[in-house]
């Protein structure tokens, strides 16, 4: 589950608990869709009050994969007002910076802008061999990587710079710091690396 969605569940925790969501078909639907296991259902049903059952469900959901939040929304057929509240909170969270971006401390207007040649150069200096899977995650191909290597056979940094410039040319306005941030996370590199590009 995305950090933003976890935050939404956390912020509405008490309100959701008061609705006692576990009394209807919610658990069965989540089980049917593979979000909850049989053990989870037993554990939740073993709780003595509806509030505790709902709280335990809210504790379990964040660790149940990327589809957990959307499937939870789908499960709330009997609670349309709760579903609307969650959707609204999620939309508001989307207009704020997602939690993962707050960590980097980068304002949203910069996250939505494209890096300059100088900034790409700074990123290239700091990236190791993970630059290849990163540019693949950004949408370049193995052929692009091969060409960058062929054009600069003896200079890895120049290969990296050319790869990111190709990415920026190809994706235009979509080639943003936000995309770089997501790319760094995809290859498990600390996204705070972007802060050095902005110094």
UniProtKB/Swiss-Prot annotation:
Chief location category: cytoplasm
Impact reported for residue 27 to F: Loss of interaction with CASP2
UniProt GO molecular function: death domain binding; protease binding; protein-macromolecule adaptor activity
Compartments (UniProt record): Cytoplasm; Nucleus
Location of the CARD domain: 1-91
Annotated effect of mutating residue 65 to A: Loss of interaction with CASP2
Death domain segment(s): 116-188
Expression (tissue specificity): Constitutively expressed in most tissues, with particularly high expression in adult heart, testis, liver, skeletal muscle, fetal liver and kidney.
Keywords: Apoptosis, Cytoplasm, Disease variant, Intellectual disability, Lissencephaly, Nucleus
CDD domains linked to this entry: CARD_RAIDD (cd08327), Death_RAIDD (cd08319)
InterPro entries on file: CARD, CARD_RAIDD, CRADD, CRADD_Death, DEATH-like_dom_sf, Death_dom
Gene Ontology terms describing biological process: apoptotic signaling pathway; cellular response to mechanical stimulus; DNA damage response; DNA damage response, signal transduction by p53 class mediator; extrinsic apoptotic signaling pathway via death domain receptors; positive regulation of apoptotic process; positive regulation of apoptotic signaling pathway
Pfam family, one: CARD
Resulting phenotype, residue 169 to E: Loss of interaction with PIDD1
Membrane-crossing segments per the record: none
Record annotation: effect of changing residue 149 to E: Loss of interaction with PIDD1
GO cellular component, one term: cytoplasm
Record comment regarding domains: The Death domain mediates the interaction with PIDD1 and the formation of a complex composed of 5 PIDD1 and 7 CRADD proteins which in turn probably recruit 7 CASP2 to form the PIDDosome. The Death domain mediates a direct interaction with the Death domain of RIPK1. The CARD domain mediates a direct interaction with CASP2.
Subunit structure, as described in the record: Forms a complex named the PIDDosome with PIDD1 and CASP2. Interacts (via Death domain) with RIPK1 (via Death domain); the interaction is direct. Interacts with TRADD. Interacts with TNFRSF1A.
Biological role: Adapter protein that associates with PIDD1 and the caspase CASP2 to form the PIDDosome, a complex that activates CASP2 and triggers apoptosis. Also recruits CASP2 to the TNFR-1 signaling complex through its interaction with RIPK1 and TRADD and may play a role in the tumor necrosis factor-mediated signaling pathway.
Pathological condition linked to this protein in its record: Intellectual developmental disorder, autosomal recessive 34, with variant lissencephaly: A disorder characterized by mild to moderate intellectual disability, megalencephaly or enlarged head circumference, and a mild variant of lissencephaly with anterior-predominant pachygyria with shallow and unusually wide sulci and mildly thickened cortex. Some patients may have seizures.
Protein name: Death domain-containing protein CRADD
Organism name: Homo sapiens
């Amino acid at each position: 589950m995305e950090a933003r969605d976890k935050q939404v569940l956390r912020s509405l925790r008490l309100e959701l608990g008061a609705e006692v969501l576990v009394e209807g078909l919610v658990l069965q639907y989540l089980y049917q869709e593979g979000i909850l296991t049989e053990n989870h259902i037993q554990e939740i049903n073993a709780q003595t009050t509806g509030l505790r059952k709902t709280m335990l469900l809210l504790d379990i959901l964040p660790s149940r994969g990327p589809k957990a939040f959307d499937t939870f929304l789908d499960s709330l057929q009997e609670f349309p007002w709760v579903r609307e509240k969650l959707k609204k909170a999620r939309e508001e969270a989307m207009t704020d910076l997602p939690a993962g971006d707050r960590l980097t401390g980068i304002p949203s207007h910069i996250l939505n802008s494209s890096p300059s040649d100088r900034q790409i150069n700074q990123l290239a200096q700091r990236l190791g061999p993970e630059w290849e899977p990163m540019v693949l995650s950004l949408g370049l191909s193995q052929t692009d990587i091969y060409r960058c290597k062929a054009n600069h056979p003896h200079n890895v940094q120049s290969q990296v710079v050319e790869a990111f410039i190709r990415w920026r040319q190809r994706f235009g306005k979509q080639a943003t710091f936000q995309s770089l941030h997501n790319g760094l996370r995809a290859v498990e590199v600390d996204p705070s690396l972007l802060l050095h590009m902005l110094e």
